[in-house]
Amino acid sequence: YEIMPSLVGSEMCIRDSIIRLSAKGQPFCFLAQRQKTMKQYEDKELLEKIQKYIGELSYTHEPENLYMPIEYVLGLGGKRIRPVLMLMAYNLYKDDVEKIYQQAAALETYHNFTLLHDDLMDKADMRRNRPTVHKKWDENTAILSGDAMLILSFKMMMESCPLEYISEVTATFSKAALEVCDGQQWDMDFEKRLDVTVDEYMNMICLKTSVLLAASLKIGAILGGASAEDANLLYDFGIKMGLAFQLQDDYLDVYADSSVFGKNIGGDICSNKKTFMLITALEKSSGK
């Protein structure tokens, strides 16, 4: 597979990369299947649509102290890459993207649940230039609100999902959700080791970061009625894209402007997190 150079360092130049991606020198099956009359949305249009949808989600349930942090976390913004990727994959086959807004929002809810618990485990003070949930409220609230977000994400994913796709969507989402937890545990285990290899690290970030991006594309394709081959090709592309994003994030952790990056610079290394740059530096310093 080929990942276009323009992908690394960008936020939303994904569609051209998907279109130009090839498998064994052959274009994706869906390129020949496209209907000329089908509306193709720009990524910015899809971002605006899903931002509006997520912004209008109501979390006014009781008890207030359980749901207010959820609304706070989802209101912090972010690139919304995962839901946009789902909508883009769906739009390769159908143009009624509004039918899967709920599933796209479910994926973003799950992603933000992982960030909420990540911040707690990392004892991070900031997220997108705002206090983290355990700082604004307390640690117990962060745990419980995160648990609620996890449950809500699965509830949202299954509601209104067409019956013929429920089994495949559930399997894809559940697999990715569990693999993210696998990756988080490996990440924590690596904090206690100085001999982590680049291969081990790449496997860890594949689980922690790539699989959810890949699942976004695959679920969007499934809901759009794609063939199994197309859905799997999009999944594979998502894996490689996730690796590129995480390696870029490692670089930004060291060299970015904190006012732009939204996190403390060097925070990962200071908390003994293994990053590609730290592992490479350790290998070079030991003569490997």
Provide a role label for each language-model segment.
Residues Y1-D16:
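Single conserved hydrophobic/aromatic residue that forms the stacking wall/gate
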Residues S17-I19, R34:
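Short, positively charged and aromatic/hydrophobic N-terminal segments
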Residues R20-F28:
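N-terminal amphipathic/hydrophobic targeting modules at extreme N-termini
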Residues M38-L57:
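N-terminal amphipathic/basic leader segments beginning at the initiator methionine
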Residues G55-G287:
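Mg2+-dependent prenyl diphosphate-binding active-site environment of isoprenoid biosynthetic enzymes
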